[in-house]
């Protein structure tokens, strides 16, 4: 599923439509009837971790105070949530996002349970409704264009993907949402202290979570502490920190955990910057056969016995597994 940096790019693409009225709808969604959005006004959009939220109102003037502006490309270690420079991404006409079709199979990370936040269709006439968009494996948002088939399916048909939701706006443009779950919510699920791309990200909370007596690769995917972090960021941060994915957090020194969190934030921020600047993503170990040092990369699915197994890439030489004895701090 799209990770935090890509979902923030989706947010950037949707933001220019804030303040416009939905004049026509379409899509294959069964749980949410696209027609229920007809004539509503898109008044706000927010992004939190891997989730995108869209606020719809009945009237043009009912937008909430302090509506979220489009996030700017981060210039510092932590993503800032201010206004974006339109020159870096351009106008919405003809733009579309990359759908990440080259990725291997991804599953929902541990701790990302949608059930407690979902509601039934919002009552008719209820102002301030938030549409919660949870993206699937190849989830994407397209602007003023539709996704096209890149290859034939198993039956040999060149059938274009079917959008889950299409919103046409009074300004003439439209948005198409693919491979996603749509549900109404009374308000966005907001926990900025666990969002790895938020300036309010709580490092202390993340470091404490990493100290648990379980493999660090499990903890990194726990959205309660690392919202927006997915399999790509997990693999790349662990490699850059030189930590074996199955190393128990409880045996890592405080300094090693600090380094790991640093790499999580740095890689995520660089990925987001690249999205805004049109630069391709470069990975060192994810889906690689060799690491930058020329060593053979191992691949295996890891996860809790009662949880989801996620494909993991690591270099046994650059990321040696630690014993279960805590690391000792060295003083010079």
UniProtKB/Swiss-Prot annotation:
Modified residues (Phosphoserine): 68
Gene3D superfamilies: 1.10.8.50
Subcellular location: Nucleus
Regulation: Acetylation of Lys-50 leads to loss of DNA nicking activity. Acetylation of Lys-154 has no effect.
Binding site for DNA: 231
Outcome of mutating residue 295 to A: Loss of glycosylase and AP lyase activity
InterPro entries named among the record's database cross-references: DNA_glyclase/AP_lyase_DNA-bd, FPG_cat, Ribosomal_uS13-like_H2TH, Znf_DNA_glyclase/AP_lyase
Region of interest (Disordered), residue spans: 59-121
Keyword field contains Zinc: yes
UniProt xrefs under PROSITE patterns: FPG_CAT, ZF_FPG_2
Active site (record annotation): 2 (schiff-base intermediate with dna), 3 (proton donor), 50 (proton donor), 310 (proton donor)
GO cellular component, one term: intracellular membrane-bounded organelle
This protein's UniProt keywords: Acetylation, DNA damage, DNA repair, DNA-binding, Glycosidase, Hydrolase, Lyase, Metal-binding, Multifunctional enzyme, Nucleus, Phosphoprotein, Zinc, Zinc-finger
Keyword Lyase: yes
Main location group: nucleus
GO biological process per UniProt: depyrimidination
Family the entry assigns: Belongs to the FPG family.
Quaternary structure annotation from Swiss-Prot or TrEMBL: Binds EP300.
Protein name (Swiss-Prot/TrEMBL): Endonuclease 8-like 2
Gene giving rise to this polypeptide: NEIL2
């Amino acid at each position: 599923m799209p990770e935090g940096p890509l979902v923030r790019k989706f947010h950037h693409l949707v933001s220019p439509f804030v303040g416009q009225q939905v004049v026509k709808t379409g899509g294959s969604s069964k749980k949410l009837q696209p027609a229920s959005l007809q004539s509503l006004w898109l008044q706000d959009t927010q992004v939190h971790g891997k989730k995108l939220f869209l606020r719809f109102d009945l009237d043009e003037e009912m937008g909430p105070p302090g509506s979220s502006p489009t996030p700017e490309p981060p210039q510092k270690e932590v993503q800032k949530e201010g206004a974006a420079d339109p020159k870096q991404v351009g106008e919405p006409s003809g733009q579309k996002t990359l759908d990440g079709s080259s990725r291997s199979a991804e599953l929902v990370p541990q701790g990302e349970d949608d059930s407690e936040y979902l509601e039934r269709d919002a009552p008719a006439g209820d102002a301030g409704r938030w549409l919660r968009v949870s993206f699937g494996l190849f989830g994407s948002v397209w602007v003023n264009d539709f996704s096209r088939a890149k290859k034939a399916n198993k039956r040999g048909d060149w059938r274009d993907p079917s959008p889950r939701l299409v919103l046409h706006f009074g300004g003439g443009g439209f948005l198409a949402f693919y491979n996603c779950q749509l549900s109404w919510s009374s308000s966005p699920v907001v926990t900025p202290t666990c969002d790895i791309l938020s300036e309010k990200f709580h490092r202390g909370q993340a470091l404490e979570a990493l100290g648990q007596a379980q493999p660090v690769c499990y903890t990194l995917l726990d959205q309660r502490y690392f919202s927006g972090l997915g399999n790509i960021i997990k693999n790349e941060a662990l490699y850059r920190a030189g930590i074996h994915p199955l190393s128990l957090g409880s045996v890592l020194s405080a300094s090693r955990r600090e380094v790991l969190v640093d790499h999580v934030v740095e890689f995520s921020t660089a990925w987001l910057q690249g999205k805004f600047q049109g630069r391709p993503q470069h990975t060192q170990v994810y889906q690689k056969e060799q690491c930058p040092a020329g060593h053979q990369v191992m691949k295996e699915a890891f996860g809790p016995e009662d949880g989801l197994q996620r494909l993991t890439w690591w270099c046994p030489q650059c990321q040696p597994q630690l014993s279960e004895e805590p690391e000792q701090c060295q003083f010079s």
